[in-house]
């Protein structure tokens, strides 16, 4: 269920977790609360349950867990700053650190794409399993495939693969060292080592966060882009491999030849039916290479679908300085995130899995349960992010919390969610979508995250067709309202020109940037001609075309802020 509680098990030594759990702002308004009696000094948060923290804390613990408040005694000692590494771990006084022995833990998970979201999400859940439940077979070997990830290789390598997770909310900040990544491989340095690691019998899951563009799926046909230069190069056997599917196929082919079971391919990307997409793209790639191996994967493999949620901004120099000053930790690349986090995961695995549910993951029996949650999240949270991102950037804002603080933008987002998206969503027993929308507005308003709009705006070619256009298509079919949704698409089309309202150029961060910018500079309306994203149906609908033209004309004539006010 949707929950606003920290989903890690609560312990007396977990700084601020218990305080946050009892704050009214983080109590789930979506669920029927179930009482649960704490056992000893450990209390697990069960999905769908609200639990009262243990009360047998000493005064000392109560003072440590108190929220940041200038009127209270200082909440921590100010130590000398220490470089984060295994040697210094025991000397860090103001952060939660791993107490498990990292050296003897097996790497049952290989994760491709060690970015901020992975480090704040899957790696944090696994860290909880290692810390609280002695899951000794399930640490992570991180993998990056692209040369641009070299700074991550260097940062983790200098810190024994440790990093700090900074959790920010409106009432304070806490920090926790994550130790679940116990090995790291950089494919440009040694692609063979990556394939060998995936093929190793100890590897049971290969998970990935490679973004929408990393799946090479035609958004119109939902088929693998066989003619894409990267896919074509991998199918031709060029070295080093360019795509995740070349690595997955090579490793699975070795396991097939060795008589091993296939590993589970677990997508953690923010896409609807991410498991099904992973399966279809990999099988299409494998059939081009060896139909026998493809059939073996299809029959024996597993590709669980999931819904993932945690806002994770880019790490700034300011975040690093804050970590050093307030917590005494020198970390080359900490990850910054919110307190809220959620993961709904289909229970479909080929070769075993860790007890994810013990760490707060909502493990569900079939894909239909996942689809209900992910549809709500993608159509509300991600669509709203896009609506704020493109129009907000054009309007001169810098951060998401600034956009949502603007009364006209806030009204526009709320009305778009309630009037144009909510009527299209499934009804889930025990879940109030109205309350979920209200909670989203609160999450967007968090000023401590400083979530920059350029992060929200990157990769729009993989976002708008997934988050916005399906709702527009359904409203067209139903004859329902679509003005605000169409304005979101129009703002993206206008954004693709790469020129802001002050006439200043900016760089587009999108895998289709060259093609899309050329269309937008010709005329923003021409972006609709890109069939791989939009097909033909939308261009043929007179009502949508009229709404799109009106929105584009208003953006051009009046600017983003005035247009939002008209549409709110």
UniProtKB/Swiss-Prot annotation:
- Please list the reactions this protein catalyses: D-mannitol + NAD(+) = D-fructose + NADH + H(+)
Q: Does the keyword Oxidoreductase apply?
A: yes
TM region(s), chain numbering: none
Recorded GO MF terms = mannitol 2-dehydrogenase activity; mannitol dehydrogenase activity
User: Which keywords does this Swiss-Prot/TrEMBL entry list?
Assistant: NAD, Oxidoreductase
Q: What is its EC number?
A: 1.1.1.67
Keyword NAD assigned to the entry: answer is yes
Broadest EC class assigned to this enzyme: oxidoreductase
Entry binding sites for NAD(+): 109-120
Recorded family membership: Belongs to the mannitol dehydrogenase family.
PANTHER family assigned to the protein according to its UniProt record, in alphabetical order: MANNITOL DEHYDROGENASE 2-RELATED, MANNITOL DEHYDROGENASE DSF1-RELATED
Task: State the function annotated in the UniProt record.
Answer: Catalyzes the NAD(H)-dependent interconversion of D-fructose and D-mannitol in the mannitol metabolic pathway.
- Subunit architecture: Monomer.
Q: What is this protein called?
A: Mannitol 2-dehydrogenase
To which species is this protein native?
Phaeosphaeria nodorum (strain SN15 / ATCC MYA-4574 / FGSC 10173)
């Amino acid at each position: 269920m949707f929950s606003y509680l920290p989903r890690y098990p609560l312990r007396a030594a977990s700084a601020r977790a218990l305080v946050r759990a009892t704050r009214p702002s983080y109590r789930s308004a979506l669920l029927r609360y179930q009482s649960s009696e704490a056992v000893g000094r450990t209390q697990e948060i069960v999905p769908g349950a609200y639990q009262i923290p243990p009360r047998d804390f000493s005064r000392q613990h109560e003072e440590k867990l108190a929220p940041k408040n200038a009127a209270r005694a200082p909440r921590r000692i100010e130590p000398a700053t220490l470089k984060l590494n295994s040697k210094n771990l025991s000397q860090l006084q103001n952060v939660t650190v791993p107490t498990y022995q990292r050296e003897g833990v097996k790497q049952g998970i290989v994760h491709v794409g060690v970015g901020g979201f992975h480090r704040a999400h899957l790696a944090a859940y696994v860290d909880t399993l290692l810390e609280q439940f002695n899951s000794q077979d399930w640490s992570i070997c991180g993998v990056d495939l692209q040369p641009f990830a070299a700074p991550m290789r260097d940062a983790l390598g200098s810190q024994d693969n440790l990093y700090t997770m900074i959790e920010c909310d409106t009432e304070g900040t806490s920090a926790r060292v994550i130790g679940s990544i116990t090995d790291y491989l950089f494919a440009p340095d040694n692609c063979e080592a990556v394939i060998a690691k995936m093929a190793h019998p100890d590897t049971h899951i290969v998970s990935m966060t490679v973004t929408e563009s990393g799946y090479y799926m035609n958004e119109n046909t939902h088929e693998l882009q066989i003619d894409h230069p990267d896919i074509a190069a991998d199918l031709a056997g060029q070295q080093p491999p360019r795509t995740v599917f070349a690595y997955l196929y090579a490793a699975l082919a070795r396991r097939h030849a060795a008589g091993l079971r296939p590993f589970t391919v677990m997508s953690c990307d923010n896409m609807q039916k991410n498991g099904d997409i992973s399966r279809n793209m990999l099988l299409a790639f494998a059939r081009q290479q060896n139909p026998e191996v493809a059939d073996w994967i299809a029959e024996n493999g597993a590709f669980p679908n999931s819904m993932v949620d945690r806002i994770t901004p880019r790490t700034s120099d300011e975040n690093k300085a804050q970590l050093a000053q307030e917590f005494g930790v020198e970390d080359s690349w900490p990850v910054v995130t919110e307190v809220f986090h959620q993961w709904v995961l289909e229970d479909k695995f080929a070769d075993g899995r860790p007890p994810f549910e013990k760490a707060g993951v909502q493990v569900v029996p079939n894909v239909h349960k996942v689809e209900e949650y992910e549809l709500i999240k993608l159509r509300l949270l991600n669509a709203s992010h896009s609506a704020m991102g493109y129009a907000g950037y054009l309007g001169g804002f810098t951060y998401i919390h600034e956009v949502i603080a603007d009364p006209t933008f806030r009204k526009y987002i709320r009305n778009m969610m309630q009037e144009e998206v909510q009527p299209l969503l499934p009804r889930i027993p025990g879940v109030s979508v109205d309350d979920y929308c209200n909670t989203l507005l609160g999450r967007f308003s968090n000023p401590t995250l400083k979530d920059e709009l350029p992060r929200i705006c990157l990769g729009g070619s993989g976002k708008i067709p997934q988050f916005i256009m399906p709702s527009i298509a359904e409203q067209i079919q139903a004859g329902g309202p679509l003005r605000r949704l169409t304005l979101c698409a129009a703002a993206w089309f206008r954004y693709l020109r790469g020129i802001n309202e002050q006439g200043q150029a900016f760089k587009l961060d999108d895998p289709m940037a060259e093609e899309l910018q050329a269309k937008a500079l010709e005329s923003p309306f021409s972006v609709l001609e890109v069939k791989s994203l939009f097909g033909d149906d939308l261009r043929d609908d007179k009502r949508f075309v009229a709404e799109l033209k009106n929105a584009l004309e208003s953006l051009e004539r009046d600017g983003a802020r005035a247009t939002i006010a008209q549409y709110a």
